[in-house]
């Protein structure tokens, strides 16, 4: 997993010849010095459409190294098991993974189609009985996986971007037109027949 180290903008202090020459008694505390715009942490933003519920979400869920609890709760609800209504507590790395995939593709802020988010054990069993390629111990049941596509981006490109990040598992489902990504161990697989 690649961790993004973010330093709160108020803790960053830039050294310029003028500040180096300033006596310590005249120095302005770093917290009182506004950070240049280029040093202010950019927000982590997700736009998603859930293909089963028809719901959309457009939300900033993180600023710098701070996750926004209300936004995270809304994402958890959005990614609930659409069969049972059960709301998970998603692994935050999944949200960051989606953001990193968009950045890698050069489409930050693009709307992501969600094919499958969280699954209860009941839903996972149901899918195993009716579809191909559903793992017995799927990371969807741990809220550590998501099946997606991005309109306008081929699923081959999407798969390649996810693989290049080396942040978890990547499943390629070309017939069903989606890519599975998770924050488990780094691995890859492909299912050439219809399935989830």
Residue ranges and their predicted role:
Residues 1-47, 194-196:
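N-terminal secretory targeting signals
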Residues 44, 49, 133-196:
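Catalytic cores and adjacent binding grooves of peptidoglycan-active enzymes
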Residues 44-62:
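Mature N-terminal segment immediately following signal peptide/propeptide cleavage
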Residues 55, 107-112, 166-169:
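Loop/turn elements at helix/coil->beta-strand transitions in domains of secreted/extracellular proteins
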Residues 63-115:
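Active-site acidic/histidine clusters and adjacent loop/turn architecture
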Residues 72, 95-102, 124, 128, ...:
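Extracytoplasmic/secreted envelope proteins and their assembly/folding machinery
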Residues 110-126:
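Acidic helix-start/capping segments at beta-turn-to-alpha-helix junctions
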Residues 122-136:
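Charged, often glycine-rich, active-site loop that binds/positions anionic groups
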């Amino acid at each position: 997993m690649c961790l993004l180290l973010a330093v709160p903008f108020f803790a960053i202090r830039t050294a310029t010849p003028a500040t180096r020459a300033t006596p310590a008694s005249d120095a302005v505390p770093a917290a009182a010095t506004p950070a240049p715009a280029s040093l202010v942490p950019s927000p982590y933003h997700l736009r998603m459409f859930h293909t089963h519920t028809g719901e959309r979400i457009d939300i900033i869920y993180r600023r710098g190294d701070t996750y926004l609890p209300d936004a995270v709760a809304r994402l958890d609800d959005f990614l609930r098991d659409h069969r049972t209504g059960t709301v998970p507590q998603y692994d935050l790395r999944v949200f960051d993974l989606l953001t990193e995939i968009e950045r890698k593709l050069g489409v930050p802020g693009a709307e992501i189609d969600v094919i499958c988010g969280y699954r209860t054990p009941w839903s996972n069993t149901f899918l195993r009985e009716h579809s191909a390629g559903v793992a017995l111990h799927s990371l969807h049941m741990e809220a550590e996986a998501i099946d997606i596509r991005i309109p306008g981006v081929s699923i081959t490109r999407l798969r390649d971007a996810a693989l290049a990040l080396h942040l978890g598992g990547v499943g390629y489902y070309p017939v069903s037109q989606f890519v599975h990504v998770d924050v488990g161990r780094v691995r890859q697989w492909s299912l050439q027949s219809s399935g989830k």
